[in-house]
Curated annotation (Swiss-Prot):
Bilayer topology term: Multi-pass membrane protein
Organism annotation: Methanocaldococcus jannaschii (strain ATCC 43067 / DSM 2661 / JAL-1 / JCM 10045 / NBRC 100440)
Keywords: Cell membrane, Membrane, Transmembrane, Transmembrane helix
Transmembrane segments: 23-43, 107-127, 137-157, 168-188
Entry-linked Pfam families: EMC3_TMCO1
Protein name per Swiss-Prot or TrEMBL: Uncharacterized protein MJ0480
A molecular-function term among this protein's GO annotations: small molecule binding
Record localization: Cell membrane
One of the record's GO cellular component terms: plasma membrane
Length: 198
């Protein structure tokens, strides 16, 4: 039953994305998909979260943190701040609740996109069928960036949990998942600024 559901799902997304997957390098195709997904998530956040209230909460919490830091050396003032700290904890809880609201609607589509990208760019996936010599590398990062992003650690971690499939060909190489995550963080940050999301 689930096999036929996923077949329909894959065929539907293939109809949408296969033209760019066949023509573009995997790095560019995944970047485009990450931009589309980030745009959808950020628009959902913009529509579902009261941005004015988020800004108010963040400002009040930040002001308290500055005050707390200044008065941390004075025990008398710290007692006074204890009461305010309770209120700030409630504001933090409200802020967290607001930030989780869009996740309720976007979590499932994100998981489905990961499943689709694995179907296309994973070991034995569609892209490897189209390009049999492909080794699974989507992009090679500059050495300094691979050190900053701890690529060696992620390769090691992946080797523990994922047996078989593509082999690690370089300490600077990223596969589809690493590249998608990197693109997603970058595009989401830019889109949040453009859309004025706090």
């Amino acid at each position: 039953m689930f096999g036929s559901i996923f077949d329909i799902y894959y065929k539907t997304l293939d109809a949408i994305f296969m033209p760019i997957i066949k023509v573009l390098h995997p790095a560019l195709a995944i970047l485009i998909i990450a931009i589309i997904v980030s745009l959808i998530i950020n628009i959902a956040t913009k529509l579902l979260v009261d941005q004015k209230r988020v800004a108010e909460l963040k400002k009040e919490i930040q002001e308290f943190q500055v005050k707390f830091k200044k008065m941390s050396k004075n025990p008398e003032m710290m007692e006074k701040l204890q009461e305010e700290q309770q209120r700030i904890m409630q504001l933090n809880a409200e802020l967290m609740k607001m930030s989780f609201r869009p996740m309720i609607y976007t979590w499932v589509p994100i998981i489905l996109i990961f499943i689709y990208l694995r179907h296309v760019y994973g070991f034995g996936g569609v892209y490897q069928e189209l390009n049999p010599g492909w080794n699974g590398v989507v992009v090679y990062l500059p050495i300094i960036l691979s050190k900053i992003l701890f690529i060696d650690f992620w390769h090691w971690l992946g080797s523990i949990f994922y047996k078989g499939g593509f082999k690690i060909v370089s300490n600077t190489a990223l596969g589809w998942l690493g590249w998608y995550i990197l693109c997603s963080f970058a595009t989401s940050t830019v889109l949040r600024k453009i859309l004025g999301i706090k």
